[in-house]
């Protein structure tokens, strides 16, 4: 099944740029990188695909140094003519050859007319070993699981997509979009699983797909363990992480006897691979956003569908009407972060939450989001506006009057006031509009 991915537009811009550079497409395993590039290849007259897990395909990079000789060897290997233009060369599984990664820069320096894209599984580890490229020689894009809008496009629900992109949101579409978003919240955005679900419309059929994905990730990380002890630790971390509470501590993680340093190293490996991100807080209420890595982080999973499967929640979720109140709000927080991550394709975006920088009292705001010169606080919870105590503490010290709450409710803007009397504007936004936060922040500030 071919999906409509928003990253495709970025690929078209890259193709049209007369000064394009070799492109590395980054992202976790099984998010659809190879499928997307094969779709994109139809924009070219000539397409050559290499898989460096194959000995025949990796040999030119391993045995030759001159980039023009490498290219001639590829043409010979693939039985391809030597086209002058409109050629896309796709180097898949490039993590298998550090030398091939280093050679990418020479396509730009010596063969700038060629379009070259590289991708791979656990590519982040290989890139880390290779080190940085000279500035301006390589471009990067990031592909994520399907977001809610891409899920709707896959279901060919164009009316829902139109409503989702209407600002402000039309009142008649609320019920329908909530139901569709709850469906997406159960399934998640992994392409193989979404394709299976759309074809059969049967959640029960998906368990084997989820389990296979989890096992693939576990097996992948075993490759990066230097001994059996590290292998066991990585497997423990990836299996235990879904069960952890909102914020984690490396010390005694999962009630284990592993040392804080060992757990931290393992979690940073998972973060590097994009499977489980470490999300750190800021204590700032104004720009710049400076995260504090000494404070306890949250864990953000690659995909909410995988998390639901790991926690065996999908059956319960079939009857849920308000995700704010389900599983202590963990699933909706994960999902909103996933939506925000997915709209950032040009760099590795991580959500940030806020904590008060005082030991005498604790306060947390679920998200802060940069808009121009403002840091907008965002809560992901229901309840009366007057009971949002952490948000009140943020608004008491920030330099603007705008706050947002994502919940299972209709869109409205209310005049609010903190306990100490600070007045502010609160935008109540349906949580299915999380990916549209940039548009709604602009609309909110522009109209209120």
Predicted regions and their residues:
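N-terminal pre-Walker A segment at the start of P-loop NTPase domains
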Residues: 1-16
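Conserved lysine of the Walker
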Residues: 33
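Hydrophobic positions on the alpha1 helix immediately C-terminal to the Walker A/P-loop
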Residues: 36, 40
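Short glycine-rich substrate-engagement loop in P-loop NTPases that contacts/grips substrate
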Residues: 54-85
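Interdomain motor-coupling "hinge/lid" segment immediately C-terminal to the ATP-binding subdomain
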Residues: 128-247
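Accessory nucleic acid-recognition modules appended to NTPase machines
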Residues: 195-364, 369
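Conserved catalytic cores of phosphodiester-cleaving nucleases, focusing on short active-site segments
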Residues: 340, 365-384, 403
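Domain-level recognition of nuclease-like catalytic cores that cleave nucleotide substrates
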Residues: 411-448
């Amino acid at each position: 099944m071919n999906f409509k991915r928003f990253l495709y537009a970025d690929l078209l811009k890259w193709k049209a740029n007369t000064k394009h550079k070799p492109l590395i497409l980054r992202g976790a395993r099984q998010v659809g990188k190879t499928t997307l590039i094969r779709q994109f290849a139809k924009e070219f007259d000539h397409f050559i695909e290499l898989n460096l897990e194959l000995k025949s395909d990796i040999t030119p990079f391993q045995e030759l140094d001159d980039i023009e000789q490498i290219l001639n060897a590829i043409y010979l290997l693939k039985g391809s003519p030597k086209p002058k233009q409109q050629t896309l060369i796709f180097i898949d599984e490039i993590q298998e050859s550090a030398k091939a990664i280093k050679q990418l820069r020479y396509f730009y320096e010596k063969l700038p007319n060629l379009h070259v894209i590289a991708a791979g599984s656990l590519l982040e580890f290989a890139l880390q070993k290779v080190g940085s490229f000279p500035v301006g020689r390589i471009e990067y894009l990031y592909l994520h699981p399907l977001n809610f809008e891409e899920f709707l496009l896959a279901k060919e629900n164009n009316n829902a997509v139109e409503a989702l992109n209407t600002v402000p949101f039309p009142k008649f579409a609320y019920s329908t979009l909530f139901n569709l978003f709850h469906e997406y919240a159960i399934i998640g955005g992994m392409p193989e699983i979404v394709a299976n679900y759309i074809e059969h419309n049967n959640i029960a059929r998906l368990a084997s797909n989820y389990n296979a994905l989890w096992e693939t990730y576990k097996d992948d990380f075993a490759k990066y363990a230097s001994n059996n002890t590290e292998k066991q630790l990585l497997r423990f971390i990836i299996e235990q992480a879904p069960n952890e509470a909102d914020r984690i501590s490396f010390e005694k993680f999962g009630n284990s006897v592993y040392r804080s340093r060992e757990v931290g190293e393992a979690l940073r490996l998972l973060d590097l691979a994009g499977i489980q991100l470490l999300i750190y807080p800021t204590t700032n209420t104004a720009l710049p956003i400076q995260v504090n890595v000494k404070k306890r982080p949250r864990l953000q999973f690659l995909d909410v569908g995988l998390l639901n499967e790991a926690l065996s929640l999908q059956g319960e979720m079939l009857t849920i009407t308000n995700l704010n109140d389900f599983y202590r709000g963990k699933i909706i927080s994960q999902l909103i972060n996933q939506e925000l991550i997915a709209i950032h394709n040009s760099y590795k975006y991580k959500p940030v939450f806020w904590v008060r920088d005082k030991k005498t009292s604790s306060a947390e705001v679920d998200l802060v989001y940069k808009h121009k010169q403002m840091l907008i606080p965002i809560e992901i919870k229901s309840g009366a506006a007057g009971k949002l105590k952490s948000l009140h503490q943020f608004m008491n010290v920030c330099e603007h009057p705008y706050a947002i709450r994502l919940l299972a409710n209709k869109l409205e803007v209310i005049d609010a006031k903190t306990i100490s009397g600070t007045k502010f504007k609160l935008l109540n936004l349906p949580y299915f509009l999380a990916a549209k936060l940039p548009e709604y922040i602009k609309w909110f500030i522009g109209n209120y």
